């Protein structure tokens, strides 16, 4: 699979230019998935996706060329050759590269492509939101801060606080927009806009606990969001449920699917012991240690907004009886291969939260 190959290349890249090559390969390999349906909406979404990501890539490439034109090839090893650059040059290059990466990470104001990409099928949406594309941008931000500039240089240039502010704005804005959506996939899309910026926030705070929180969220958000998209896809495929109002009685019709969806949603809110609580806990500790106590308000506000747009879905599904006339002729959860992926990732979300901190736990 070309997408998996590109994502693996991004993770294993040892230099900026190698990272960029795989970064672009990921864009080109995911575009056909966005336009897969071939209808007008999908084509428009694909066009928007390319425009946004290509503009971001141009900014990133310009920053890389500027950097390497002065210092030579830049390895991911906090290159001391960066000391040759002036403070202004370092700041502008940082803005170009982080801004370019921020497009793929769907940070405000470069997030517009992500909700439109919901025209793609649910498995593709899961790939875009939980596994590959937005995570490539967020991962790139972390690597650029820590492995190219280094946290000492970022702190010296006072570049962390502005990035933390942008990430915080994105977190709250994405949650507010999610609250306005009636389409389930669009609600999940704006939720991703919010949640992925936790990773950039952790990197910008430049402390050990905040960094752990951001990197842990890279994994945890992926598990929870892919669970939500798998479950949403099953609901749409089996029952035709695509909007919030149609969720009435879904828990009685498809209890296993809704169990998986509920675990993912509660994890996004930050309810222990699901995975999302762990990453938010580390981010909160890191914020206090770094003197960014205002970040606690951002985390608390985001969690409350997450509850505001997820709990009504769960209430409709579990506590409101389905209208008999709305029952489709088909019944049950559907084939095992439809529900099993959501259950597996839901259990993984629960397991990594329960066993976080254990000796054998990678998180």
Model-derived features with residue positions:
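Short phosphate-coordinating micro-motif centered on Lys-Gly-acidic
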Residues: 24
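Cytoplasmic/organellar membrane-interface segments at the starts of transmembrane helices
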Residues: 244, 251-258, 310-363
């Amino acid at each position: 699979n070309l997408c998996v190959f590109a994502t693996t290349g991004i993770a294993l890249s040892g230099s900026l230019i190698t990272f960029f090559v795989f970064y672009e390969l990921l864009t080109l390999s995911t575009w056909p998935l966005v336009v897969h349906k071939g209808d007008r909406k999908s084509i428009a979404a694909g066009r928007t996706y390319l425009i946004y990501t290509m503009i971001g890539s141009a900014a990133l490439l310009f920053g890389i060329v500027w950097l390497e034109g002065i210092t030579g090839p830049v390895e991911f090893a906090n290159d001391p050759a960066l000391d040759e650059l002036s403070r202004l040059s370092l700041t502008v290059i940082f803005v170009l590269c982080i801004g370019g990466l921020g497009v793929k990470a769907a940070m405000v104001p470069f997030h517009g492509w992500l909700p439109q990409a919901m025209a793609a099928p649910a498995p593709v949406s899961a790939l875009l939101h939980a596994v590959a594309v937005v995570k490539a941008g967020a991962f790139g931000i972390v690597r650029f801060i820590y492995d190219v500039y280094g946290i000492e240089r970022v702190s010296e240039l006072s570049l962390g606080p502005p990035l933390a502010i942008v990430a915080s704005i994105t977190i709250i804005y994405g949650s507010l927009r999610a609250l306005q959506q009636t389409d389930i996939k669009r609600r999940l899309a704006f939720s991703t806009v919010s949640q992925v910026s936790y990773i950039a926030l952790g990197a910008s705070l430049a402390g050990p606990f905040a960094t752990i929180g951001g990197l842990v969220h890279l994994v945890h958000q992926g598990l929870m969001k892919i669970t939500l998209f798998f479950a949403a896809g099953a609901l749409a495929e089996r029952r035709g449920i695509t909007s919030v109002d149609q969720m009435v009685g879904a828990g009685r019709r498809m209890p296993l699917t809704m169990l998986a969806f509920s675990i993912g949603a509660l994890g996004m809110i930050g309810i222990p012991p699901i995975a999302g609580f762990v990453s938010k806990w580390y981010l909160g500790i890191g914020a206090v240690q770094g003197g960014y106590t205002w970040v606690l308000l951002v985390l608390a506000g985001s969690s409350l907004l997450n509850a505001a747009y997820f709990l009504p879905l769960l209430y409709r599904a579990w506590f409101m009886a389905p209208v008999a006339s709305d029952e489709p002729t088909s019944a049950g959860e559907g084939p095992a291969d439809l529900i099993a992926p959501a259950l597996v990732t839901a259990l993984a979300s629960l397991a990594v939260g329960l066993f976080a901190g254990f000796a054998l736990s990678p998180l």
